[in-house]
């Protein structure tokens, strides 16, 4: 199931996404987030996390980093990589 979902996202990235204007306000893009979430948390939780991310991505949201969290969560991961690296070096 995991491979089927990842393949579906890859097909979207290859065939559909290039025909649409760039719209994702987060890094990584919503489709890459979906793939990472499925690979890290499995098909059920990954699909739920990816869908929640797509619903969060709209013109009125605050753009920025939204990395896939280590633990399952449907909320935005507000930790930015720069801050995380600073904390790790302490």
UniProtKB/Swiss-Prot annotation:
Task: Recite the UniProt keywords alphabetically.
Answer: Cell membrane, Membrane
Where does it primarily localize? Answer: membrane
* SMART domains, alphabetized: Haemolytic
State the superkingdom: Bacteria
Q: Where in the cell is it found?
A: Cell membrane
Provide the membrane topology annotation: Peripheral membrane protein
Q: Which cysteines are joined by disulfide bonds?
A: none
Q: Which Pfam families match?
A: YidD
An annotated GO cellular component of this protein is: plasma membrane
What function does the entry list? Could be involved in insertion of integral membrane proteins into the membrane.
By its UniProt entry, which NCBIfam families does this protein fall under?
membrane protein insertion efficiency factor YidD (TIGR00278)
Q: Which family does it belong to?
A: Belongs to the UPF0161 family.
PANTHER family associated with the record: MEMBRANE PROTEIN INSERTION EFFICIENCY FACTOR-RELATED (PTHR33383:SF1)
UniProt-recorded name of the protein? Putative membrane protein insertion efficiency factor
| The organism of origin for this protein | Lactococcus lactis subsp. cremoris (strain MG1363)
């Amino acid at each position: 199931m995991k491979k089927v979902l990842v393949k579906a996202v890859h097909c979207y990235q290859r065939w559909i996404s290039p025909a649409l204007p760039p719209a994702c306000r987060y890094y990584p893009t919503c489709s890459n987030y979906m793939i990472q979430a499925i690979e890290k948390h499995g098909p059920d939780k990954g699909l739920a996390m990816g869908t929640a991310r797509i619903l969060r991505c709209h013109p009125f949201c605050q753009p920025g980093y939204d990395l896939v969290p280590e633990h399952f969560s449907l909320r935005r991961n507000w930790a930015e990589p720069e801050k995380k690296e600073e904390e790790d070096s302490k």
